[in-house]
């Protein structure tokens, strides 16, 4: 008897935002105390962001990941001990090592010895992690994967730089992916170009117990915008081609929630109506690797994304990295 083709499909989603919601006006008031001028109108006009969430000083990235993971596991209705692969996409890990994924595995009480590791592709991290987990499952190496995007970007923001500190927030999103004979993940594409590493980076490093270089995020906004709008359409089309789907067959587009102008530009280039694009950047800000699974969970739980629908995710981030996946939910 011929062996059936193995696929991976999304069983459940989850997300978590720390309770400290900071509006643009509240952030502007904080910055004004240090002589930094900005306003709600200025931020909204350039980014579409109205608010973001910041984690408390004693809350770690793995803490955020833990809650999102619990919610995804509950939604998937799986035994945590059946999860034999954990991938955490983050650029703000708890420690230099061990990985946030190992810390999360322990917090979840998973004792089966399954693989656990982090992926560092910044805002493309979740797209990278999802594609990697899909490959592991399709080849039979693992059967049930927990993929988490989690960030505490507030820890690396320079609050004297209004061009970056107004953009980012903290949060986590998660999905449970499981082996299935029914197609789920239909096509993925991943890319990087290290020659653009300087346009979005946090260049500091630990050297003999001292942070060498800047530990703050640095960004050339214009260069990032120009590159992002160019590569996102191309990688989306590539993933669609691998999935044997046309753009008009996509029910929902979930772009990395970086900036409403980048998001709408990609949506327009793909010929999709704006109504099919999931937008959470207005309330969450840019949560880097957490932004796509956060938006996915919001749209699943409010009933917009339904079983059987086609979803296209795409992300672009520091590195420079970019990626996309198409899946049937």
UniProtKB/Swiss-Prot annotation:
This protein's pathway: Lipid metabolism; fatty acid biosynthesis
Region: ACP-binding, residue numbers: 257-261
One GO MF term attached to the UniProt entry: 3-oxoacyl-[acyl-carrier-protein] synthase activity
Protein's GO biological process: fatty acid biosynthetic process; secondary metabolite biosynthetic process
Catalytic activity, EC: 2.3.1.180
Active-site annotation: 123, 256, 286
Role this protein plays: Catalyzes the condensation reaction of fatty acid synthesis by the addition to an acyl acceptor of two carbons from malonyl-ACP. Catalyzes the first condensation reaction which initiates fatty acid synthesis and may therefore play a role in governing the total rate of fatty acid production. Possesses both acetoacetyl-ACP synthase and acetyl transacylase activities. Its substrate specificity determines the biosynthesis of branched-chain and/or straight-chain of fatty acids.
Name the record gives this protein: Beta-ketoacyl-[acyl-carrier-protein] synthase III
Organism encoding this protein: Burkholderia thailandensis (strain ATCC 700388 / DSM 13276 / CCUG 48851 / CIP 106301 / E264)
Lineage: Bacteria, Pseudomonadati, Pseudomonadota, Betaproteobacteria, Burkholderiales
Originating gene: fabH
């Amino acid at each position: 008897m011929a062996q059936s083709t193995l696929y991976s499909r999304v069983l459940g989603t989850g997300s978590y935002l720390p309770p400290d919601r900071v509006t643009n006006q509240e952030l502007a008031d904080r910055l004004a105390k240090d002589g930094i001028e900005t306003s709600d109108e200025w931020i909204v006009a350039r980014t579409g962001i109205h608010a973001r969430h910041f984690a408390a000083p004693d809350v770690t990235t793995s803490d955020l990941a833990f809650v999102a993971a619990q919610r995804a596991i509950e939604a998937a209705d799986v035994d945590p001990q059946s999860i034999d692969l954990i991938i955490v996409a983050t650029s703000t890990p708890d420690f230099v090592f061990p990985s946030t994924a190992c810390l999360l595995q322990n917090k979840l009480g998973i004792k089966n010895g399954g693989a656990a590791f982090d992926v560092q592709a910044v805002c493309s991290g979740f797209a990278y992690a999802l594609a990697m987990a899909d490959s592991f499952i399709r080849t039979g190496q693992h059967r049930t994967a927990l993929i988490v995007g989690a960030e505490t970007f507030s820890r690396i923001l320079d609050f004297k730089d209004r061009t970056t500190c107004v953009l980012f927030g903290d949060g986590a999103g998660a999905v449970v992916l499981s082996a299935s004979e029914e197609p789920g993940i239909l096509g993925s594409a991943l890319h990087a170009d290290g020659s653009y590493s300087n346009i979005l980076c946090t260049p500091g490093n630990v050297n003999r117990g001292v942070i060498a270089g800047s530990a703050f995020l640095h960004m050339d906004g214009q260069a990032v915008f120009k590159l992002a709008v160019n590569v996102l359409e191309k990688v989306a089309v590539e993933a669609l081609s691998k999935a044997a789907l046309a753009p008009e067959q996509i029910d929902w587009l979930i772009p990395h929630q970086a900036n409403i102008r980048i998001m709408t530009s990609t949506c327009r280039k793909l010929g999709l109506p704006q109504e099919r694009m999931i937008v959470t950047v207005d309330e969450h800000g840019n949560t880097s690797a957490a932004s796509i699974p956060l938006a996915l969970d919001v749209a699943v739980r409010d009933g917009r994304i339904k079983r059987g629908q086609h979803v296209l995710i795409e992300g672009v981030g520091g590195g420079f990295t970019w990626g996309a996946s198409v899946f049937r939910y």
